[in-house]
């Protein structure tokens, strides 16, 4: 459903499930479809809000402009405070939101992301070339190259059909070239290295041990910089850790966001097992 923010700006979004609100902020090149492993699990416990990151009109103020759109969306939905999960570029937006509008952020989950700037370890030139699809001659080849670099070998070997489905989704529902480049430029300029320590929301950092786009050293530095933050580093996963190790990610997130007493009262079979293939069946 599109939300009219200004005369020229709208945001496509979905709200699913009931419970405390949980805002999911996707990364570069992904739309709401990228949460196909999370929605079945999270909607059991949370009013889960997903939306498509924009950028067509330019991001003069970088990630701050994307954060402004998030605030407008929450205002439209009447959400006064929400848990927030951001992946990659979405993690940048989540950090900006937690710093600039701490009144809106309850608990914070940052996955496959960093605090920007130089950081402890930069993306290698080869990984950057793969992400941008350099050396390819079609949109499909570029998407495949980027997604291969974003996932670990174990995942691609065990779930080749699912990987191919993600490639198809990426091609069918990806940002415009202008939006993609604006988002990429905003991410390149992002730097909260001197401010991230002021985040006050309880924070969980999740990362894949084989992430080529955001090397794991960045996750360790991020968790160390945010007071009291917890770190979960998952093996056999790359940048798309929330897809590759979805069961573990979902379990960690639900456990972190839900009070212990509430978890005991509403204990149910593992949500994560039901997420396997559910969205693939409905979309395939």
Which residue ranges define each predicted feature?
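Short beta-strand/loop motif that positions the catalytic acidic residue
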Residues: 199, 205-207, 211
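Gly/Ala-rich beta-loop-alpha elbow adjacent to hydrolase catalytic centers
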Residues: 86, 90, 94
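Active-site loop/oxyanion-hole signature of alpha/beta-hydrolase fold enzymes
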Residues: 40, 49-85, 251
């Amino acid at each position: 459903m599109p939300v009219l923010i200004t005369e020229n700006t709208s945001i496509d979004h979905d709200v699913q499930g009931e419970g405390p609100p949980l805002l999911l902020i996707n990364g570069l090149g992904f739309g709401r479809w990228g949460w196909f492993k999370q929605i079945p699990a999270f909607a059991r416990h949370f009013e889960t809000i997903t939306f498509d990151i924009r950028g067509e009109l330019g991001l003069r103020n970088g990630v701050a402009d994307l954060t402004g759109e998030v605030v407008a969306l929450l205002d439209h939905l009447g959400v006064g405070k929400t848990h927030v999960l951001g992946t990659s570029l979405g993690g940048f937006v989540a950090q900006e939101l937690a710093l600039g509008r701490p009144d809106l952020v309850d608990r914070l989950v940052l996955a496959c992301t960093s605090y920007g700037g130089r950081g402890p370890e930069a993306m290698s030139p080869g990984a950057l070339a793969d992400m941008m699809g350099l050396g390819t001659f079609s949109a499909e080849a570029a998407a495949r190259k980027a997604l291969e670099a974003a996932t670990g070998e174990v995942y691609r070997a065990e779930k080749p059909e699912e990987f191919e489905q993600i490639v198809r989704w990426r091609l069918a529902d990806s940002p415009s070239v202008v939006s993609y480049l604006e988002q990429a430029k905003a991410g390149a300029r992002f730097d909260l290295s001197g401010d991230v320590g002021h985040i006050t929301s309880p924070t969980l950092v999740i990362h894949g041990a084989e992430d080529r786009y955001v090397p794991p050293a960045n996750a360790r530095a991020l968790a160390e910089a945010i007071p009291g933050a917890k770190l979960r580093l998952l093996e056999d996963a790359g940048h798309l850790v929330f897809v590759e190790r979805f069961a573990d990610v979902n379990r960690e997130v639900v456990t972190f966001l839900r009070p212990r007493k509430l978890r005991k009262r509403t204990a149910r079979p593992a949500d994560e097992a039901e997420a396997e293939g559910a969205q693939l069946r409905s979309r395939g």
